[in-house]
Curated annotation (Swiss-Prot):
Its cofactor is Mg(2+). This is Cyclin-dependent kinase 2 homolog. It comes from the Eukaryota. Residues 4-284 form the Protein kinase domain. May form a complex composed of at least the catalytic subunit CRK2 and a cyclin. The lineage of its organism: Eukaryota, Sar, Alveolata, Apicomplexa, Aconoidasida. ATP binds at I10, G11, E12, G13, T14, Y15, G16, V17, V18, K32. The active site is at D125 (proton acceptor). Keywords: ATP-binding, Cell cycle, Cell division, Cytoplasm, Kinase, Magnesium, Metal-binding, Mitosis, Nucleotide-binding, Phosphoprotein, Serine/threonine-protein kinase, Transferase. Serine/threonine-protein kinase. Involved in the control of the cell cycle. Required for entry into S-phase and mitosis. Probable component of the kinase complex that phosphorylates the repetitive C-terminus of RNA polymerase II.
Length: 298
């Protein structure tokens, strides 16, 4: 760790503490110190293997993992440093982002996800806090692959409950078959939040989360989602809700935007659009280079 000088603590994420630091060459980076639950066992070798794979991910919309430093009891991941995230930006922009900015960010999120899915790596915990943005308006996904390496804890390093707001209904209902569709659900939730300025499904428990989802998308049944009856938490007595029109949920979205979000936020994971398909959607046909309309992101 002598190569890095800690400058300040910048956050406490799901897995541990994050510091802003400087290396011997004067470059700024982010150090993510991973907390290990099993104090006696040290770092699981599977985790180190998984993390090493992430060093091979190189894409403009993925936060670069520069280095991995591990001792017996501590694992430190060294990432490129970005000083803004989508949550901070949304908090500062009352009423949602400009439509062109939201479109650019969504496209970049999908590019990063498509790349990772092509490499068979899932995120499983996408949320505005781990979508980082630089001063040129380039968006990068952070924490890809960490869920598989360390499992997503119920409570974070600071004992805050890890958010359920972006979690897919199949996962909430106990599905262990994680597929690329779990990330697409999260992206759909983030898309709605960028447009509306508020979270789409701000649940306070797993049950409340499902209820909020069903209130908008309708209560699932065997016809709409054939596999739902096989999920551990499926309850045939779920309160019945009618599906609502997307135009009333995201009124600022145009027709092609509504079509795209409706394909992302399908209850049945099999029916969700893939990242690769989403990138070809009509919604993006008028997209220009990101930097053209992101001069307001600082």
């Amino acid at each position: 760790m002598r190569r890095y000088h800690k400058m300040e603590k910048i956050g406490e994420g799901t897995y541990g503490v994050v510091y802003k630091a400087q290396n011997n060459h004067g470059e700024i980076c982010a150090l993510k110190k991973i907390r290990v639950e099993e104090e006696d066992e040290g770092i699981p070798s599977t985790a180190i293997r998984e993390i090493s794979l992430l060093k091979e991910l190189h894409h403009p919309n993925i936060v670069w993992l520069r280095d991995v430093i591990h001792s017996e009891k501590c694992l430190t991941l060294v990432f490129e440093y970005l000083d803004q995230d989508l949550k901070k930006l949304l908090d500062a922009c009352d009423g949602g982002l400009e439509p062109t900015t939201a479109k650019s960010f969504l496209y970049q999120i999908l590019r990063g996800i498509s790349y990772c899915h092509d490499h068979r790596i899932l995120h499983r915990d996408l949320k505005p806090q781990n979508l980082l943005i630089n001063r040129e308006g380039v968006l990068k996904l952070a924490d890809f692959g960490l869920a598989r390496a360390f499992a997503i804890p119920v409570r974070s390093y600071t004992h805050e409950v890890v958010t359920l707001w972006y979690r897919a209904p199949d996962v909430l209902m106990g599905s262990k078959k994680y597929s690329t569709a779990v990330d697409i659900w999260s992206v759909g939730c983030i898309f709605a939040e960028m447009i509306n300025g508020v979270p789409l499904f701000p649940g306070i428990s797993e049950q409340d989360q499902l209820k909020r989802i069903f209130k908008i998308l309708g209560t699932p049944n065997v016809d709409s989602w054939p596999q739902v009856v096989n999920l551990p938490a499926y309850n045939p007595d779920f309160c019945y809700y009618e599906k609502q029109a997307w135009s009333s949920i995201v009124p600022k979205l145009n027709e092609s935007g509504i079509d795209l979000i409706s394909r992302m936020l399908q209850l049945d994971p099999v029916q969700r659009i893939s990242a690769k398909e989403a990138l070809k959607h009509d919604y993006f046909k008028d997209l220009h280079r990101p930097s053209e309309f992101l001069n307001g992101v600082h």
